[in-house]
């Protein structure tokens, strides 16, 4: 054979086309959740959130138990006298009270008898005046001796009305007689037969005017009559002093947020008071409501995309990855629904306003914490038990006083009671002539308070009264004692954890070094998925540096490197509060660092010793008003003010509804008798009054003339015994019986409640006094002991799974992976088609010619089947970290992270030195006129004035209204039972009774 000569190497073939992408490998198992990272430092507070919508009104809470009585409230200013009310309807007659036992006998001593004056001729009777308001029932005086009854005279003829005689001069006042011992009641005399009515006499001639008689000496004090029925309640007096504040009731559940009241007009600034002594350190207040969440920073800048790697062949299925680090603690879920509001507690009595406390010091700002890198979300944990209740929040500042509400509509009338049985009506006698006004007896012993009377019928609703003038603000009271520390409240339920959001593209491998921040570049194409990076070790938390003085807020600069931790320094004195600086620009959010494992909770250190007071600082600006302090101690009662001049009578106000019947107070001491004033001039006739409400039933008129004698009828059948008649009208008191006055007995039982009487006319309004000067600000109280820190409650249970979170930002493009090993050559392809024959060449020389040039390559054959996947190449060493890419555009804000735990309360700062006294403010506008002062004690009786000349006869006034019925006399003898009357028509059906017991 011939020697085979190797020909020259042919040109390299064209590069093969890349094979199809391999199918994705099976998904790896999710690793167990890693341990929670350490809690980052507390970030700065976020901006205040907007007010949420008003919640629904809570159900009324249960009435709170009445607490111990609070300290005595300061004496309130006397209220403004109300407008005179219209005369109310006549109340029902009260039941007669039980007769009290006679009191002990006083010393019997006769006073000198005055000289009797000449008896003047009686003048003509004037028109009956309208009945005044009944005053409080006076103490019953001892009964005096009653003169013997004269023989009954025959009814004379009605004389003509004589002219009014001149007024007699008042006699000199005799010495007051000694109170005599009450005599025993005499036996009741037998009722005499009723006399025939006399015939009407002829009208008598007009009598001449009599000469003025000399006023007689005052007689002995009359016998003490029986206690009259309780008179109608007088007009409501001025508002009394505020009572002692009641103990605060148990705090009910928080009700629904009410609508904000209208903002009051800001008053003029008051003068700056002296800085008070440093107040006691208050107990640590309860944990306040969490502030609104701060804005979450945008995602970090996106790096440059890596170069596109060459798609290698499909690798074998990957091994199960190692469990990833524990995800951070899930964010708290939504707050639980508020519980139903409890019934409102009993309203406590109004206490005196406390003085505002001293302004607190502003602590130095803490170092800003760095945000930890959020880990993958862990599975939702089991729901924990409810924590203990947290401390109640601090008392907020007093809000603006709301407007006075409009007067409510009167309630519906009560159910009609069962109809009572009607007794026989007793005959009402004609009213007797008015006797001379007796002197007021000495004060008797105070009787036991009677039962409350039955409520009178509701009067027509009165018109709304005019708003009263605002009173003068009172002086600031002394600061109250520091309140007790409240209990720590239960922590709220843990919110529901939301499901983890869809996983973003896998991130970079090993973390690179932070380079200088460049300008934002255009986003590149997404790179291929790189290998997972190793989690770095968490760094140690540096100690907080010394807080410097608070300066003006500057523009936010770039974030610098963390400094070396310094030692804890001594807390400096709080400097003066500077003026607010301009708001700085918001800085870019830094890169999120890796989260380290949670460290053990350190033990709480012991409180440090109290430092020495520092040098005095300059006076700070006036702080906001402090919270309402505890009511101060009751001050000593002030001296009674002088009685002001009587003001003009106010216009008559509308009739108000009858108020509740108050207990009858003890009668006051007898005042000295005043001197008689000169007779007044005849007044002008008054204007026609408004038509008042229907008056009470008038008294029975005098008996009419006797009618003709009727024929004697036949004796009818005896009727059935009728119902017991009502007690008859009280007859006139009988003459006193013989015997000595007995000693007074013990107080009798309390009488039955009286009925409400008509509302009396209010007195004239006094002159409004000038507002007093505003008192200086009181010193704050001494600091109290600091309370013990509360114990941390158990962690709450994990909430239910929440809705899926938003899609996270795309991860950074990883570096290109290494090219895989070259695959094994594929199978040989089928031979290609034969080429077309070439042009016929020249005939060659005889013999073997030189080897011809290689022919052109044939057309590529069809693609052969895909070769088998080669073995997965080993991971090569990590290349050096490339330079940091420029910062990408800021992404959308991510979801809010969980709120950090509240740090421990810092140590108490040193006590500040008393600042300089501020300058007095401008004098405010004059306050509204104050309420009239209380009526002073009655002055001593002055000497009797000289006798004045007789006044001229006045013009007769208009006919007055029917007078009110007189007091009920002592009970008369019981009348005989009358014959049974005809059966009346059936009454209306009564209201249905209450349901019986089950």
From Swiss-Prot:
One of its GO terms (biological process) is extracellular matrix organization. The modification 4-hydroxyproline is found at residues 18, 21, 24, 33, 48, 63, 69, 78, 84, 116, 122, 143, 152, 155, 182, 185, 197, 203, 212, 218, 221, 236, 245, 248, 260, 269, 284, 290, 299, 305, 323, 332, 338, 344, 353, 356, 365, 374, 380, 392, 401, 410, 413, 431, 449, 455, 461, 467, 473, 479, 491, 500, 511, 523, 526, 532, 538, 547, 565, 580, 607, 613, 616, 625, 631, 649, 658, 667, 679, 685, 694, 703, 706, 727, 736, 744, 753, 771, 780, 783, 789, 804, 810, 816, 825, 831, 851, 854, 857, 929, 932, 950, 965, 971, 986, 989, 992, 995, 998. One of its GO terms (cellular component) is extracellular space. One of its GO terms (molecular function) is extracellular matrix structural constituent conferring tensile strength. Its main location: secreted. Contains mostly 4-hydroxyproline. Proline residues at the third position of the tripeptide repeating unit (G-X-Y) are hydroxylated in some or all of the chains. InterPro entries: Collagen, Collagen_superfamily. The modification Phosphoserine is found at residues 93, 595. These protein fragments were extracted from an ancient femur bone collected in Buenos Aires, Argentina. Belongs to the fibrillar collagen family. This is Collagen alpha-1(I) chain.
């Amino acid at each position: 054979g011939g020697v085979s000569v190797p020909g020259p190497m042919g040109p390299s073939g064209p590069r093969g086309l890349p094979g199809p992408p391999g199918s994705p490998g099976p998904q790896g198992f999710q690793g167990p959740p890693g341990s929670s990272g350490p809690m980052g430092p507390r970030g700065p507070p976020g901006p205040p959130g907007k007010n949420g919508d008003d919640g629904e009104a809570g159900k009324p809470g249960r009435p709170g138990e009445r607490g111990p009585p609070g300290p005595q409230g300061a004496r309130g200013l006397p209220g403004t006298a109300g407008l005179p009310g219209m005369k109310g309807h006549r109340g029902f007659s009260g039941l007669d009270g039980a007769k009290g036992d006679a009191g002990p006998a006083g010393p019997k001593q006769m006073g000198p008898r005055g000289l009797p004056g000449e008896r003047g001729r009686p003048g003509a009777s004037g028109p009956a005046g309208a009945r005044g308001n009944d005053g409080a029932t006076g103490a019953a005086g001892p009964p005096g001796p009653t003169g013997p009854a004269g023989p009954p005279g025959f009814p004379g003829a009605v004389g003509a009305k004589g002219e009014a005689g001149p007024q007699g001069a008042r006699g000199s006042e005799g010495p007051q007689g000694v109170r005599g011992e009450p005599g025993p009641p005499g036996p009741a005399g037998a009722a005499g037969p009723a006399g025939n009515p006399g015939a009407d006499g002829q009208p008598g001639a007009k009598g001449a005017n009599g000469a003025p008689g000399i006023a007689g000496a005052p007689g002995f004090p009359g016998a003490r009559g029986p206690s009259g029925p309780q008179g109608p309640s007088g007009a409501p007096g001025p508002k009394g002093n505020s009572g002692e504040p009641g103990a605060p009731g148990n705090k009910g559940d928080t009700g629904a947020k009410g609508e904000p009241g209208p903002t009051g007009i800001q008053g003029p600034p008051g003068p700056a008071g002296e800085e008070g002594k440093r107040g006691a350190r208050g107990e640590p207040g309860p944990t306040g409501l969490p502030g609104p969440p701060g804005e979450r920073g945008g995602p970090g800048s996106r790096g440059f995309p890596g170069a596109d790697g060459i798609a290698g062949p499909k690798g074998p299925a990957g091994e199960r990855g190692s469990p990833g680090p524990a995800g951070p603690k899930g964010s708290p879920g939504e707050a639980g629904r508020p519980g139903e509001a409890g019934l409102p507690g009993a309203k406590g009595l109004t206490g005196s306003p406390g003085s505002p406390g001293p302004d607190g010091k502003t602590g130095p700002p803490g170092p800003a914490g760095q945000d930890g890198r959020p880990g993958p979300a862990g599975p939702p944990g089991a729901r924990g038990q409810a924590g203990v209740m947290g401390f109640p929040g601090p008392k907020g500042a007093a809000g603006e006083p709301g407007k006075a509400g409009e007067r409510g509509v009167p309630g519906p009338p009560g159910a009609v009671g069962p109809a009572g049985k009607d007794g026989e009506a007793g005959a009402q006698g004609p009213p007797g002539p008015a006797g001379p006004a007796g002197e007021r007896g000495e004060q008797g012993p105070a009787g036991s308070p009677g039962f409350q009377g039955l409520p009178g019928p509701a009067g027509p609703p009165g018109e709304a009264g005019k708003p009263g003038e605002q009173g003068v603000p009172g002086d600031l009271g002394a600061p109250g004692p520091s309140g007790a520390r409240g209990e720590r409240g239960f922590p709220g339920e843990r919110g529901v954890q939301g499901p983890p959001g869809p996983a973003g593209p896998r991130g970079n491998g090993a973390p690179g070094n932070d380079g200088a921040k460049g300008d934002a570049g255009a986003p590149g194409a997404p790179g291929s998925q790189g290998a997972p990076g190793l989690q770095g070790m968490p760094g140690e938390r540096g100690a907080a540096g010394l807080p410097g003085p608070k300066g003006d807020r500057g523009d936010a600069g770039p974030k610098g490197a963390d400094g070396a931790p310094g030692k804890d320094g001594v807390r400096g004195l709080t400097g003066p509060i500077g003026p607010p600086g301009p708001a700085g620009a918001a800085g870019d959010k830094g890169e999120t660092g890796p989260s380290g494992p949670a460290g053990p909770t350190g033990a709480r250190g012991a409180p440090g010793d109290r430092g020495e007071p520092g040098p005095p600082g300059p006076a700070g600006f006036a702080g906001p008003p402090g919270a309402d302090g505890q009511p101060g101690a009751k001050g000593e009662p002030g001296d009674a003010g002088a009685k002001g001049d009587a003001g003009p009578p106010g216009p008559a106000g509308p009739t108000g509804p009858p108020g509740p019947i108050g207990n009858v107070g003890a009668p006051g001491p007898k005042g000295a008798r005043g001197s008689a004033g000169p007779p007044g001039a005849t007044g002008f006739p008054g204007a026609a009054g408004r038509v008042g409400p229907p008056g009470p039933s008038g008294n029975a008129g005098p008996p009419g003339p006797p009618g003709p004698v009727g024929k004697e009828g036949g004796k009818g059948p005896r009727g059935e015994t009728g119902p017991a008649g009502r007690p008859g009208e009280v007859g006139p008191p009988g003459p006193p019986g013989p015997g000595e006055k007995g000693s007074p007995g013990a107080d009798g039982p309390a009488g039955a409640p009286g009925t409400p009487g008509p509302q009396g006319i209010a007195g004239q309004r006094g002159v409004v006094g000038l507002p007093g000067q505003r008192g200086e600000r009181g010193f704050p109280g001494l600091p109290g002991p600091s309370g013990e820190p509360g114990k941390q409650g158990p962690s709450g249970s994990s909430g239910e799974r929440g809705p899926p979170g938003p899609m996270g930002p795309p991860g950074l493009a990883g570096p290109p992976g290494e090219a895989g090993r070259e695959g094994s050559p594929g199978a040989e392809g089928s031979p290609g088609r034969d080429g077309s024959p070439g042009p016929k060449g020249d005939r060659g020389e005889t013999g073997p010619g030189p080897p011809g040039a290689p022919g052109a390559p044939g057309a590529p054959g069809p693609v052969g089947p895909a070769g088998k996947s080669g073995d997965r190449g080993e991971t090569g060493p990590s290349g050096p970290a490339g330079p940091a890419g420029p910062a990408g555009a800021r992404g959308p804000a991510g979801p809010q992270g969980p709120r950090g735990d509240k740090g421990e309360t810092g140590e108490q700062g040193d006590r500040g030195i008393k600042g300089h006294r501020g300058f007095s403010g401008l004098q405010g506008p004059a306050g509204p006129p104050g309420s009239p002062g209380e009526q002073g004690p009655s002055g001593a009786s002055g000497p009797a004035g000289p006798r004045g000349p007789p006044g001229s006869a006045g013009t007769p006034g208009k006919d007055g209204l029917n007078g009110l019925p007189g007091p009920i006399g002592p009970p008369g003898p019981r009348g005989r039972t009358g014959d049974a009357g005809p059966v009346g028509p059936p009454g209306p059906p009564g209201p249905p009774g209450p349901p019986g017991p089950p």
